[in-house]
């Protein structure tokens, strides 16, 4: 089968045409992939950065954002059948640790990542445990279903705290950040302000519903808050950038008693003014992945009640032009990039 493989310990990802079709275990489902999306993680793997060198076994079929149809099921699988349209949770958990048994599988200490620690979905076929398969309703388009993984990150982060009537600050206008903007507006936030230094992505944030999209290299966030009539700071912060300066600016802009959800991963150690956290009584919450499967339920429910995340998909390529997809993702001048397998 065709697959995109990290086959060398160097910058790049390469297509092969002779990867073996994965076998199906008794508790597994094999999915024929229709569309894949490129994740920021895939770009890290492409770049072969420090994290990738520590983490990715080579060779590895990468990718974990996709939609497809069930091709085959294992002998013990009863919930899915060939032809079902599905996507899949990219975190494979142990099922037996304390958190898994308590229903907190997103906090499993033994998580294995599809396309990171086990073969991924940049391939004509991918195999995952049946417990990780999620059926896609007929009224959700393929290309939207293909980005359920990052949409789930945005949903988990945005819905961590009450948003109705609140003023929300989103730091980082990448695809997950701008989807969080749309979610916050959809569920009833008042002002949703997003900060970044990338004008292309700030423009995308405006299209996704941001009250204000602020280039902090040129604009003063405090002046924007004053212009919006905000006197006490933001009530909820969604840190999506992984940038220490953005996080510190967020802490300064939060109201007393505010709540901050952090999804962005900062490189190394970042110093902050902890007195801001203590004296403001801030609540900080780390976010990882998606709650299994409450986040998925909410993702579908919001789409079916009018949320439109489709503007975040800005580029589409056939799979044989995957290099163009990675090039545009690496340029920073895109939202989500979807690759079509032509099946």
Swiss-Prot record:
Q: Where in the cell is it found?
A: Cytoplasm
Q: Which UniProt keywords apply?
A: Cytoplasm, Metal-binding, NAD, Oxidoreductase, Zinc
Which GO terms are recorded in the biological process aspect for this UniProt protein?
A: L-threonine catabolic process to glycine
Q: Which pathway features in its UniProt record?
A: Amino-acid degradation; L-threonine degradation via oxydo-reductase pathway; glycine from L-threonine: step 1/2
Reaction equations catalysed: L-threonine + NAD(+) = (2S)-2-amino-3-oxobutanoate + NADH + H(+)
Q: Which residues are in coiled coils? A: none
Q: Which N-terminal stretch is annotated as signal sequence?
A: none
Where does the source fall among the domains of life? Bacteria
Q: Which GO terms describe its molecular function?
A: L-threonine 3-dehydrogenase activity; zinc ion binding
The residues listed in the UniProt record as binding Zn(2+) 2, with positions renumbered to this chain, are 94, 97, 100, 108
Entry EC number(s): 1.1.1.103
Membrane-spanning parts: none
Residues of the site described as Important for catalytic activity for the proton relay mechanism but does not participate directly in the coordination of zinc atom: 149
Q: Which cofactor does it need?
A: Zn(2+)
Protein name stated in the entry: L-threonine 3-dehydrogenase
Q: What organism is the protein native to?
A: Anaeromyxobacter sp. (strain Fw109-5)
Highest classification ranks of the organism: Bacteria, Pseudomonadati, Myxococcota, Myxococcia, Myxococcales
